[in-house]
Amino acid sequence: MTGAPTVSIVGAGIAGLSLAAMLRRAGVEHRILEQASAFGPVGGGIQLAPNAVRVLHGLGLAEQLAAVAARPRALQVRHWHDDRLLAETPLGPACEKVYGAPYYTVHRADLHAVLAQAVDQNALGLRSRVVAVTERDTDVELSFADGSREHSAVVVGADGIHSVVRAALTADRPRFAGGSIVRGLVPAARVPELARVPMIRLWAGADRHCVCYPVAAGRMISFSATMPARQAGSESWSTVGDNAELASAYQGWNAAVTGLIAAADVVGRWDLHDRDPIPRWTTARLALMGDAAHPMLPFLAQGGNQAIEDALTLGACLAEFGTDSVRTALRLYEALRVPRTAAVQGSSRIGPAAQARPGTEIGPAADGIERLHAMAWLYGHDAADAARSAIRRARTVLAGRAG
């Protein structure tokens, strides 16, 4: 690229670090602004589908990721009361054969650590809390909590559902989804019957569900359980939940679920919020990504995956067009990502119970393979190929205008 824009990334979560790793590989000048003073083991498990794993492999992180992840053999939907198997979608080798990349489950902190090792440490600014951004003709002014100000050619909001950068584009507010999720981590040795074979298990009830899967290379089992809630409380990853309240909410469920809940020392509670899709993520010098752009409910397990796709797309566009046409880069990124993430957001609101709708009993193996192939719109998406194709088309259009 000719000319390297100074890209300021606000937020060093999965979205921000993924973009920083992309920009580092592309040689794009950037910095990362994170309000925390240090990175810590926050959050629970996360599912990484082939559409995101493919991107992470492209960043050269295949070995590091495999070392900390687990590789579930299948996604099982089971009955809440008697643990009867309702449906099964193969993952493992079948998923890799179909989509060219594995399906992983990983602790969020482990994924974050892998990404943190892939970024330029000199570009990382901790204790840097951005409180406002002001776009001007020639740059963007960033205002910090300590009263200082800085300027950047491009600012990317990777700062989550309460994004400061998003507030410069729209006045909308997060929407409470009417429930909460309680998350926990349990040593695999405490629940050997769930750890013996690596699986994603989802127990579906009428108004709640519980899902669990291995993380930390199989040493831990991560679980999340939904609970109804009439009003919003905390949205923090670090809010402590109530073990007794959770156990009461799942009283009468099968022994696998109640035993898993009882085995957790501490649980965290996170109230569910999202936002309606918006058509505009960018201006001349601002862009949104991840939860700042498209916060979604966790029921499709694609929030982090879509943030990683965002990172590849935005990184490729900035690397290609540079300072000569930042606006072109941001518009192209927006055009590629808004329709896809809006579709994922909409599907995420349906909830996991839909996975059990084909039947109440498990069908033949072919049914599972069909379910795996039905996920092609998600797992089969190649963000790198989509970005390359769009960049070629944009270059052709620009060349025609110049001629």
Task: Name each region found by the language model.
Residues 124, 138-140, 204, 267-276:
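Short gly/ser/thr-rich secondary-structure transition/capping motifs
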Residues 198-232, 243, 250, 272:
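Active-site substrate-recognition segment that forms the wall
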Residues 8, 12-37, 156-157, 182, ...:
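Conserved mid-domain beta->alpha element of the FAD-binding
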Residues 34-37, 91-98, 228-233, 348-351, ...:
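Short glycine/proline- and charge-enriched loop/turn segments
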Residues 2-5, 67, 259, 300-301, ...:
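C-terminal helical "tail/cap" subdomain of flavin- and related membrane-associated enzymes
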Residues 38-54:
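Conserved N-terminal glycine-rich FAD pyrophosphate-binding loop of Rossmann-like flavoproteins
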Residues 2-7, 49-187, 230-247, 381-403:
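Conserved N-terminal helical subregion
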Residues 176-177, 195-199, 255-271:
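A short coil-to-beta-strand element that immediately follows conserved catalytic motifs
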